[in-house]
Structures are given as C-alpha cells and as structure tokens.
Regions:
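Intein modules and their embedded homing endonuclease domains
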Residues: 1-70, 74-75, 104
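Conserved catalytic/switch belt of AAA+ P-loop NTPases
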Residues: 136, 175-198
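Phosphate-sensing "switch" segment of ASCE/P-loop ATPases
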Residues: 200-203, 218-252
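Helical "lid/switch" subdomain of P-loop NTPase nucleotide-binding domains
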Residues: 160, 171-175, 196, 221
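AAA+/SF3 P-loop NTPase mechanochemical coupling elements
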Residues: 151-157, 191-209
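Switch/connector loops and helix/strand junctions flanking conserved nucleotide-binding motifs
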Residues: 123-124, 170-173, 214-220, 234-239
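Conserved Walker B
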Residues: 166-168, 186, 212-213
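P-loop NTPase catalytic core of nucleic-acid-dependent motor ATPases
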Residues: 48-167, 175-176, 226, 230
C-alpha cells in the first residue's frame, strides 16, 4: 500500500457522493453502498509485521521489491570491501552480516545503526541506495534529522531500512533520545497530522552517511552505532561508480 488515508464515515460518503451505483430505488452512492455491503473488508486496525499473518488486522508488509535470481554484483561487493571498508576484513564482514540480517530476519532489529563517515563523492550513497532498493516502499531516504525525530513521522510506519543522507545531530538532546530509541526500542510512536498517535512495532534499521566529522551522538561507551570511516581512493570517480550502477541495473 503506497499510503493509508483515514476518513470518518461522513467524509467517506461525501468523497464518493458523485459515484452512483445501482438502479431505481436501490440507487445510492458508492460510499453508502460499501458501508452497507455484507462482504466489505474491515479490520481492527493496521500493523506492520514483516513476514507475519496478523488475523483481523491490515498488514502493511508488501515484501521485497525484487525476486531473487542469480546475477553478478561483484563491482558492488568490491566497492563495499575496498572503498567503504578500506579493505578491512573485520569491518566488511560485520557490515555484510548486518546487511544480510536485514534481508533474512526482517522482523528483527540488531539494535545497531550503521554510520558511514567520509568525504563527498566516495560512494556512500551508492551503497545505501542500491541496498535500499531491495525493500521497495519499506525503504526511505531522508535528508534532515527532523524527518527522523520530528513529531509528524507517518512516513516511518512501514519502514525496514531508513537512510539518513547528510543528516546530523547538533547537540539536540530531545532528538538524541528519539534517535536512540528508534535504534533500540521495540515500538515506535507514529503521529499523523490531525490523528491520534498510534503505536507500531519498530522494525527500522538505520543507515546514516555524512561528510561531517561529528555525525551521531556517540560517546566513548556508546554501542548503538557502528561507525565506518570511508576510504577516498575512488573519490569523484564517475566511471567507476557508473560501472557499479550499470552492473546492478543489469541483473546484479
């Protein structure tokens, strides 16, 4: 479902008042006809429960955006290993494990956000956008911290992977608390404009990229963030990054 809209009974009838159905004395509006229909679909509420059946509730899970098939993504993998992780096997193994867990265990969160810190044009966005494309509508890219920690956050209700591109936290303690809760808490409060707050199960995995030296509120004992200092060996190499995208768009 691309989006969910809430309407009162009166608003529903008014919205479809110009869509008549039936004939003669049975002629009525589409809204009234649907409300009176014995076979109409109705739910106790909405949930986001990846890979689960939740009787009586509308599950917003739409699965993956792609079907698995054999292909060649060697350029992408090489980029992650040698540029993102600077050929550090321990770092690349952890990052690949984190990414694999996003796919294999969608309903579980590791409680760790991945932070890519490095200069512009080093390929941070290539990693995040290509990986996020696996999840379709359950992936979102945001560019401001307020999109994650602000009051109106209905865009997060059905998200598995959130990519915060060049978003950083400048000492805002309230936003810091919201951010850390998003990484570790089992539920998330979703607020839509003009509607009551709804509690959803939290399935968000957070990816952050920035060229700022101070990106996230992580102290010496912080364990919520896995910070990677990205290499710049391919900085602004359009041919190299274009080759990665071309391979991924050709079955990679």
């Amino acid at each position: 479902y691309a989006d969910i809209t809430f309407s009162s009974q009166a608003d529903l009838i008014a919205r479809y008042s110009n869509c008549p159905v039936g004939r003669g004395q049975k002629r009525t509006s589409a809204g009234k006809a649907w409300l009176a229909h014995t076979d109409r679909r109705q739910y106790e509420g909405i949930v986001f429960a990846p890979g689960e059946e939740v009787p009586g509730y509308l599950n917003l899970d739409r699965g993956f955006a792609v079907e698995p098939k054999k292909g060649d993504c060697s350029r992408f993998l090489e980029h992650v290993r040698n540029n993102i992780c600077k050929a550090d096997e321990e770092i690349s193994d952890y990052l690949f494990t984190w990414m694999a867990d996003c796919v294999q265990n969608r309903s579980r969160r590791p409680g760790i956000a991945v932070v890519l810190r490095g200069r512009q044009g080093t390929g941070k966005g290539i990693l995040c956008s290509q990986f996020g494309s696996l999840f379709g509508q359950h992936f979102i890219q945001v560019s401001q911290a307020s999109h994650l920690t602000g009051n109106f956050n209905s865009h997060l209700k059905d998200k598995l992977v959130v990519y915060a591109d060049e978003a950083f936290w400048a000492g805002d303690k309230k936003a810091e608390g919201v951010l850390k809760a998003m990484i570790t808490e089992d539920t998330i409060q979703i607020e839509m404009k003009g509607k009551d707050v709804i509690t959803f199960r939290n399935h968000i995995r957070l990816l952050v990229s920035s060229n700022h030296s101070w990106v996230v509120p992580a102290g010496n004992e912080e364990r919520r963030f896995f910070v990677i200092d990205v290499g710049d060996g391919r900085i602004q190499d359009r041919s190299y990054f274009g080759g990665i995208v071309s391979q991924m768009n050709s079955g990679g």
